């Protein structure tokens, strides 16, 4: 079977044929670094890491570009509220995202561009759009530059919308739009905000412009796959596609979108107060178990978080792991160069069917345990080799250097219980307004590498890695 993926633009599963034989160019909308990542953010990273690994297994050289949005309204708002420079917010949260990706075993990108390093490319893209009649400079002297959505006949094709039914673009203080649906390419300088010079006046880039400029710089005017969360289809990806194609670029040939991580049926987000940070979860389960949890559903499906489903995923992974470790001990070292079974490959070839692929893996565990019970060590070893190959493709190989010796979930539980007791004592001290004791407890925890953050929902703690 050839590789097939669901393409958002055509709304059908299509055979995948790369632009260049043997090479796949892949762009993923990465972090907007106004806050540390929650597990919903990282689900997208895990989904496309599995895609990348499968493409590599199939023999493709993958050029993977994952951007960093290091300047936007939210970052500026956080910086203002904290009384710090905007780049301090960006850098702090960029490091948190990088650590989260690494913790969950995501391969590093081929290139990871930051928006503020690509202002010249953005200016050139705006110039092309203005020259072609698809963008205009605001007439009020503000320095704003907007994309004229009525000038581009295909606007709305990615998100399957009709222009006349669209709502106004959410650009905040839109000062001189010709049409309320037009979106900002460039935001003219405002007092106290960072700005960069352009032929149309100083300012800073709009979110959509950033991604188009970075994607085409590193992957070319036409590339294979553009990925991201389904919540980005409109307006972000619609606007990316429109401005790039209107400028004369072919842009993405396939659009792949992962489903959302929800909790109680609602999208997980910091604004709703229902987000869970990576360190919170990895105190309950190991990082590899969290990776299994985030990657187990089909990438296009929503995944509703619950403590029960997290525990079930951890137990499911442990069944795979325990069999491999047992075979490795009984039958000798398991090789890491065995092909995956055909039914596993067929599942991933068909729009990255991870649930079906995992079913094949778990069937191997059942067969392997039966072989061990019968004393058939050679057959068990063969099954173990195939299982290891499957888990390696999914980034879950328990015998790999990434995950070997990571069985410390029990220790996490103990540490969590002990820290919770100490934090209860600190909360009691705060209630008594004994702030000296509360501060001393916090400082003592900090000396042990445990950082405490007081939130409206109560204290949170994080184990700082040295």
Swiss-Prot record:
Alphabetical UniProt keywords: Aminoacyl-tRNA synthetase, ATP-binding, Cytoplasm, Ligase, Metal-binding, Nucleotide-binding, Protein biosynthesis, Zinc
Protein name as it appears in the record: Cysteine--tRNA ligase
EC number in record: 6.1.1.16
Keyword Acetylation part of the UniProt annotation: no
Binding site for Zn(2+): 29, 211, 236, 240
UniProt subunit comment: Monomer.
Pfam families attached to this UniProt entry: CysS_C (PF23493), DALR_2 (PF09190), tRNA-synt_1e (PF01406)
Top class in the EC scheme: ligase
Record-linked CDD domains: CysRS_core
SUPFAM superfamilies noted in UniProt: Anticodon-binding domain of a subclass of class I aminoacyl-tRNA synthetases (SSF47323), Nucleotidylyl transferase (SSF52374)
Binding-site residues, ATP: 270
Motif interval(s): 'KMSKS' region: 267-271
Named cofactor requirement(s): Zn(2+)
Stored InterPro entries: Cys-tRNA-ligase, Cys-tRNA-synt_Ia_DALR, Cys-tRNA/MSH_ligase, CysS_C, Rossmann-like_a/b/a_fold, tRNA-synt_1_cat_dom, tRNAsynth_Ia_anticodon-bd
Catalytic activity: tRNA(Cys) + L-cysteine + ATP = L-cysteinyl-tRNA(Cys) + AMP + diphosphate
Cofactor, how bound (note): Binds 1 zinc ion per subunit.
GO biological process, one term: cysteinyl-tRNA aminoacylation
Motif ('HIGH' region): 31-41
Protein family: Belongs to the class-I aminoacyl-tRNA synthetase family.
Predominant localisation class: cytoplasm
Compartment(s) of residence: Cytoplasm
GO cellular component entries: cytosol
PANTHER family named in the record: CYSTEINE--TRNA LIGASE, CYSTEINYL-TRNA SYNTHETASE
Metal-binding recorded as keyword: yes
Protein's organism: Thermobifida fusca (strain YX)
Domain of life per record: Bacteria
């Amino acid at each position: 079977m050839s590789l097939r993926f669901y393409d958002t633009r055509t709304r059908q599963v299509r055979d995948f044929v790369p632009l260049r034989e043997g090479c796949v160019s892949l762009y993923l909308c990465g972090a907007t670094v106004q806050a540390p990542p929650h597990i919903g953010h990282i689900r997208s990273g895990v989904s496309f890491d599995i895609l990348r690994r499968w493409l590599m297994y199939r023999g493709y050289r993958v050029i993977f570009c994952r951007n960093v949005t290091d300047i936007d309204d939210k970052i500026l708002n956080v910086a203002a509220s904290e009384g710090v420079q905007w780049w301090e917010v960006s850098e702090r949260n960029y490091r948190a995202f990088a650590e989260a990706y690494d913790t969950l075993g995501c391969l590093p990108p081929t290139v990871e561009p930051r928006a503020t390093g690509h202002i010249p490319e953005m200016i050139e893209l705006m110039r092309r759009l203005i020259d072609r009649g698809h963008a205009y400079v605001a007439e009020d002297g503000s320095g704003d530059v907007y994309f004229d959505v009525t000038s581009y006949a295909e606007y709305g094709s990615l998100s399957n919308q009709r222009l006349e039914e669209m709502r106004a673009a959410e650009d905040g203080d839109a000062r001189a739009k010709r049409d309320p649906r037009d979106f900002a390419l460039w935001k003219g300088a405002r007092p106290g905000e960072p700005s960069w010079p352009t032929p149309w006046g100083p300012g800073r880039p709009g979110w959509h412009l950033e991604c188009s400029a970075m994607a085409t710089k590193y992957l070319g005017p036409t590339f294979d796959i553009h990925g991201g969360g389904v919540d980005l289809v409109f307006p972000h990806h619609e606007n990316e596609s429109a401005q790039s194609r209107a400028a004369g670029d072919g842009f993405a040939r396939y659009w792949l979108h992962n489903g959302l991580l929800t909790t109680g049926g609602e999208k997980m987000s910091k604004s709703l107060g229902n987000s869970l940070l990576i360190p919170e979860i990895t105190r309950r389960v190991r990082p590899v178990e969290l990776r299994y949890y985030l990657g187990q559903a089909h990438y296009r499906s929503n995944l509703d978080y619950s403590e029960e489903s997290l525990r079930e995923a951890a137990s499911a992974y442990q069944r795979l792991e325990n069999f491999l470790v047992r075979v490795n001990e009984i039958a000798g070292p398991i090789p890491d160069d065995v092909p995956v079974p055909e039914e596993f490959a067929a599942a991933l070839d068909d729009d990255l069917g991870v649930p079906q692929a995992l079913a094949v893996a778990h069937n191997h565990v059942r067969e392997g345990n039966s072989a061990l019970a019968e004393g058939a060590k050679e057959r068990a070893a063969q099954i173990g080799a195939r299982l290891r190959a499957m888990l390696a493709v999914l980034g879950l190989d328990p015998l790999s250097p990434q995950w070997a010796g990571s069985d410390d979930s029990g220790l996490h539980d103990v540490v969590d219980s002990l820290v919770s007791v100490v934090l209860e004592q600190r909360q009691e001290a705060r209630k008594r307004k004994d702030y000296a004791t509360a501060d001393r407890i916090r400082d003592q925890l900090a000396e042990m590498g445990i950082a405490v953050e007081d939130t409206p929902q109560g204290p949170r703690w994080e184990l700082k890695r040295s």
